[in-house]
Amino acid sequence: MDPCECSKGGTCNCGGSCTCTNCSCTTCKKSCCPCCPSGCPKCASGCVCKGKTCDAACCQ
């Protein structure tokens, strides 16, 4: 289950930094909004993105 409930009263900011405000998540998931640049296939399946760019450290 996705612990991020930004759509239920919080805001998910996934520009340069993946952060959510007024919600229970500390990392931004694809189900909130895309953290990684478009065209990053390994971030397209809902994993937690940790960073600004699409590289080996992007997803855990």
Curated annotation (Swiss-Prot):
Residues that hold a divalent metal cation 1 according to the record: C4, C6, C20, C23
Region Beta, annotated ranges: 1-28
Keyword flag Metal-binding: yes
Residues involved in a divalent metal cation 6 binding: C36, C40, C43, C59
Binding site for a divalent metal cation 3: C14, C18, C23, C28
Positions that bind a divalent metal cation 2: C6, C12, C14, C25
Annotated residues for binding of a divalent metal cation 4: C32, C33, C43, C47
Function: Metallothioneins have a high content of cysteine residues that bind various heavy metals.
Keyword Metal-binding tagged: yes
Binding site for a divalent metal cation 5: C33, C35, C36, C49
SUPFAM superfamilies: Metallothionein
Region (Alpha): 29-60
UniProt-annotated binding residues for a divalent metal cation 7: C49, C54, C58, C59
UniProt keywords, alphabetically: Metal-binding, Metal-thiolate cluster
Record note on domains: Class I metallothioneins contain 2 metal-binding domains: four divalent ions are chelated within cluster A of the alpha domain and are coordinated via cysteinyl thiolate bridges to 11 cysteine ligands. Cluster B, the corresponding region within the beta domain, can ligate three divalent ions to 9 cysteines.
Organism name: Perca fluviatilis
GO function terms (MF aspect): metal ion binding
InterPro entries, alphabetized: Metalthion_dom_sf, Metalthion_dom_sf_vert, Metalthion_vert, Metalthion_vert_metal_BS
Protein name as it appears in the record: Metallothionein
UniProt similarity note: Belongs to the metallothionein superfamily. Type 1 family.
